[in-house]
């Protein structure tokens, strides 16, 4: 199920993962020490809707369980 970027950012912060707002453009950078950055497109800012495909990719990139992540949303 898709989720708002605002909700995703809140969960990532709970998990100790840093989310940087874009200085230019529309991509938020998700960072965790020891892992390369992961860009998340937020064309409408924090109210952007992020598809299930990108949520699964984000979880896979950071080694998070998708079902557990979705329960936190």
Task: Indicate residue ranges for each PLM-predicted region.
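Basic nucleic-acid-binding interfaces
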Residues: 1-24, 29-73
């Amino acid at each position: 199920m898709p989720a708002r970027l605002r909700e995703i950012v809140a969960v990532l912060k709970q998990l100790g993962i840093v989310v940087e707002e874009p200085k230019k453009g529309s991509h938020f950078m998700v960072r965790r020490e020891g892992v390369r950055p992961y860009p998340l497109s937020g064309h409408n800012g924090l109210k952007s809707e992020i598809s299930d495909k990108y949520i699964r990719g984000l979880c896979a990139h950071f080694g998070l369980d998708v079902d557990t992540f979705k329960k936190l949303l």
